[in-house]
């Protein structure tokens, strides 16, 4: 796995699933391939994206700044600086300075990542802030190691939270989660179907599923009524893809 592929993997792991994630993935691919060279426009686009947390925007802004060639005097962006200040906690800043001194002596991606993993997410964000604000310089590889360690910590906590929700025994939460997943799957089906004539059937199935979820929410249904809803949709999607000559494994 190349360094940039690894960075892209870690960064995308903290972005919520949805159309925006696909858009960000495309932007990262373009940046890493040297196709997008307008840092100013890229940062303006990032700043106005909905849904993303300030920290995720800060990390993405840091990645873009490290990767896209820019004028030396280009102004640093406030939304990135605010996100990478470790919540203004002086303890985070103290640890960030210690981490920075270690990273300065480290030139490899994996070495920097290993060092950074022993620090808290707040200290890691502050350390990124130091480098972003040009208060310290490290090799690009070390900076990428720092970014990936931060993403790993964030992804770990997100995974724990997700696992708690998935394994919850509360039937109401499980019911709502199944309906949300079914609705999201239906939305994805509509986007994938496009405008071809054969797409009408897939669009119809997706539309009916979304209407069903809306009705279930409006009238209130038994928690078990949503069981299998998402899987039924996925089976319909696969059948549609097969007819279109597309062979894909299950989205599970």
Curated annotation (Swiss-Prot):
One of its GO terms (biological process) is viral budding from plasma membrane. One of its GO terms (cellular component) is virion membrane. It is found in: Virion membrane; Host nucleus. Keywords: Host nucleus, Membrane, RNA-binding, Viral matrix protein, Virion. It is a peripheral membrane protein. A motif (Nuclear localization signal) lies at residues 101-105. Residues 1-164 are annotated as: Membrane-binding. It comes from the Viruses. One of its GO terms (molecular function) is structural constituent of virion. Residues 165-252 are annotated as: RNP-binding. Homodimer and homomultimer. Interacts with NEP. Binds ribonucleocapsid by both interacting with genomic RNA and NP protein. May interact with HA and NA. Cannot bind NP without genomic RNA. Most abundant protein in virion. When expressed alone can form virus-like particles in transfected cells. Belongs to the influenza viruses Matrix protein M1 family. Plays critical roles in virus replication, from virus entry and uncoating to assembly and budding of the virus particle. M1 binding to ribonucleocapsids (RNPs) in nucleus seems to inhibit viral transcription. Interaction of viral NEP with M1-RNP is thought to promote nuclear export of the complex, which is targeted to the virion assembly site at the apical plasma membrane in polarized epithelial cells. Interactions with NA and HA may bring M1, a non-raft-associated protein, into lipid rafts. Forms a continuous shell on the inner side of the lipid bilayer in virion, where it binds the RNP. This is Matrix protein 1. It comes from Influenza A virus (strain A/USA:Memphis/10/1996 H1N1).
């Amino acid at each position: 796995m190349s360094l940039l592929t690894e960075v892209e993997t870690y960064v995308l792991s903290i972005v919520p699933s949805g159309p925006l994630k696909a858009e960000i993935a495309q932007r990262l691919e373009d940046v890493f391939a040297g196709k997008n060279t307008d840092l100013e426009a890229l940062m303006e686009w990032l700043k106005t994206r909905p849904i993303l947390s300030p920290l995720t925007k800060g990390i993405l802004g840091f990645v873009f700044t490290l990767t896209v060639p820019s004028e030396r005097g280009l102004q640093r962006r406030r939304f990135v600086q605010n996100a990478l200040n470790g919540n203004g906690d002086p303890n985070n800043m103290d640890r960030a300075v210690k981490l920075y001194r270690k990273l300065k002596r480290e030139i490899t991606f994996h070495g920097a990542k290993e060092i950074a993993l022993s620090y808290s997410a707040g200290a890691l964000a502050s350390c990124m802030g130091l480098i972003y604000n040009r208060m310290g310089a490290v090799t690009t590889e070390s900076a990428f190691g720092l970014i990936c360690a931060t993403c790993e910590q964030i992804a770990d906590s997100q995974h724990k939270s997700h696992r708690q929700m998935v394994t919850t025994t509360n039937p109401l939460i499980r019911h709502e989660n199944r309906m949300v997943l079914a609705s999201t799957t239906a939305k994805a089906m509509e986007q994938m179907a496009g405008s071809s004539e054969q797409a009408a059937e897939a669009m119809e199935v997706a539309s009916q599923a979304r209407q069903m979820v809306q009705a279930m929410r409006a009238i209130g249904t038994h928690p078990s009524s949503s069981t299998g809803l998402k899987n039924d949709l996925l089976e319909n999607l696969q059948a549609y893809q097969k007819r279109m000559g597309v062979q894909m494994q299950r989205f599970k």
